[in-house]
């Protein structure tokens, strides 16, 4: 049996999924894919526009379909998912059955700092982001943990240190 090396990064907005994913893929010599970028390319519009037109439910359906399509076509990838991808039970099942799931944990303070000037996140287009982030975390944290093969805290760690922690885990799990 040929072992696939799919690595899925999940976690809240501002956890560093895309930044860490790019470096992890480079280190492991795997292809990096960002599901949000893929959705935007496929639809020809940005995520805010999709949310405005179709709502969160419409976006989550597109997200689920794009992730399923990526996994049907690609192997040996590092995939950074959107923060809410785990809300869909089919997406959770697909991720947990097709590779190793790495939950990048971030505090609310870290998320606030990293998203302070960000206008690309539809759920954070509000003046006071903290209560929104707290609500999202309360809703999503149990789902992140339910499918995570490993939890990596990102607070105060460098990208290099986080990538090394993930790589060490993958070696121990004999995926590398």
UniProtKB/Swiss-Prot annotation:
Co-factor binding details: Binds 1 Mg(2+) ion per subunit.
Pathway as given in its UniProt record: Metabolic intermediate biosynthesis; chorismate biosynthesis; chorismate from D-erythrose 4-phosphate and phosphoenolpyruvate: step 5/7
GO terms, molecular function: ATP binding; magnesium ion binding; shikimate kinase activity
Cofactor: Mg(2+)
Keyword Kinase: yes
Positions that bind ATP: 14-19, 121
Residues forming coiled coils: none
Subcellular localization(s) per the UniProt record: Cytoplasm
Reactions performed catalytically: shikimate + ATP = 3-phosphoshikimate + ADP + H(+)
Keywords annotated in UniProt: Amino-acid biosynthesis, Aromatic amino acid biosynthesis, ATP-binding, Cytoplasm, Kinase, Magnesium, Metal-binding, Nucleotide-binding, Transferase
SUBUNIT field: Monomer.
Full protein name: Shikimate kinase
Native organism: Francisella philomiragia subsp. philomiragia (strain ATCC 25017 / CCUG 19701 / FSC 153 / O#319-036)
């Amino acid at each position: 049996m040929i072992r696939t090396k799919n690595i899925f990064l999940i976690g809240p907005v501002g956890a560093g999924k895309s930044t860490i994913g790019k470096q992890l893929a480079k280190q492991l010599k795997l292809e990096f894919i960002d599901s949000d970028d893929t959705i935007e390319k496929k639809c020809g519009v940005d995520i805010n526009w999709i949310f405005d037109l179709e709502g969160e439910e419409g976006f989550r359906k597109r997200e689920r379909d794009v992730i399923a399509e990526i996994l049907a076509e690609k192997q040996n990838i590092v995939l950074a998912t959107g923060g809410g991808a785990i809300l869909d039970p089919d997406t959770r099942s697909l991720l947990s059955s097709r590779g190793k799931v790495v939950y990048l944990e971030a505090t609310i303070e870290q998320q606030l700092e990293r998203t302070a000037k960000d206008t690309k996140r539809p759920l954070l287009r509000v003046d006071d982001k903290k209560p929104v982030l707290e609500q999202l975390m309360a809703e999503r944290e149990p789902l992140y943990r339910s499918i995570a093969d490993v939890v990596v805290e990102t607070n105060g760690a460098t990208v290099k240190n986080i990538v090394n922690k993930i790589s060490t885990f993958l070696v121990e799990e004999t995926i590398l």
